[in-house]
Amino acid sequence: MGRPIVAIIGRPNVGKSTLVNRLCGSREAIVDDQPGVTRDRTYQDAFWADREFKVVDTGGLVFDDESEFLPEIRQQAKLALSEASVALIVVDGQEGVTTADKEIASWLRHCECPTLVAVNKCESPEQGLAMAADFWSLGLGEPYPVSAIHGSGTGELLDQVILLLPSKESSEEEDEPIQLAIIGRPNVGKSSLLNSICGETRAIVSSIRGTTRDTIDTLLKREQQAWKLIDTAGIRRRRSVSYGPEYFGINRSLKAIERSDVCLLVIDALDGVTEQDQRLAGRIEQEGKACLVVVNKWDAVEKDTYTMPLMEKELRSKLYFLDWADMLFTSALTGQRVQLIFNLASLAVEQHRRRVSTSVVNEVLSEALTWRSPPTTRGGRQGRLYYGTQVSTQPPSFSLFVNEPKLFGDSYRRYIERQLREGLGFEGTPLKLFWRGKQQRAAQKDLARQKENLSK
């Protein structure tokens, strides 16, 4: 779908993720000295010679070991190859040809897409040619010496990649997808939920905490709408995380919240809302993101007619700052209600981008003032709310012009927000209210006059 894909394949610790970052001009792929840091397949955008394409990084392939994750990593690499236009096997020039390299090369010969050999860690151009020559023995064509760290040789490698990509006409860009980030603590079922949504094993699933170490982007289309689903590393308290792959993965997860259009906050139905869930909810609200709360593992809960409403009431009491978010009880294991996620997420995004006319805003405010007047101080000073207007979207933000902001306490401010929600909707998105006093209004008018004078 959309741009062509280049799959990066190789054994552990040959520098695949470093090369991905070099080819894409970013630092999104997690790089660490220990082998096996990358487990799932992760996508990044790349651009070269007036061509846009995607690079998919895969976990290190090992064929003589069936221990935890390794069969799943091979399956992820196989899925990456099935959608790729070009396969790029990365080898270590300093180590030379290994048995594992030969096994991977033999495996790639059954791949339908063309294959290139990138001989990494060739920091010296002269020695690099000699190192690369040994890899002709893999039988995959000319080996290209590169240094992922320094960037040498990557231009020539990208030139060859571009030659093998399908023509522009056959890979036209589609509309920008809605970015949906799947956020939650470790082991709440985020990757299982992603796989259930996609109908394929898109992310490795295990009962071991921290299986997903990086953010994983998946593109799919539903009812003519393109979506980018971002599965993230489970986020624990920072003091519980040592410096390394998990630390970087958590940072990527927090950045995924920033770049998302809507967040799915996944809660474990068996655990309920924990302190860390509350922190994540607060981060989503702080970033001003649309949100849907997904209560996963609903199949494992013993229930009767009253279980769901009672549990929702309990969960909402602990997630009170997300009281505007819809809550959906699902089971990634059985698929129960999983497909409803798209409907509710679409509604949340629509409301997040929605704009309301000033006249409609003030109709709602006028009715709110009729039902409950602004507070009065002990000295007899009463707050006055003159008018309001929407100033931005994503999230919907309103400026409320008053005589003096400090006269309006938290209770009355919450009341006005509730009235705006009841009168205008805005399900699934936070609202931002800015209370502007007389001095602020005067300063804004002066600034507007100055701009008008400068334009004359």
Curated annotation (Swiss-Prot):
Any GO MF annotation of the entry: ribosome binding
Keyword Metal-binding: no
Positions of the KH-like domain: 354-439
Gene Ontology biological process: ribosome biogenesis
A Pfam family per the record: KH_dom-like
Alphabetized NCBIfam families for the sequence: GTPase_EngA, small_GTP
Subunit structure: Associates with the 50S ribosomal subunit.
The protein's name: GTPase Der
Organism, scientific name: Prochlorococcus marinus (strain MIT 9211)
Gene: der
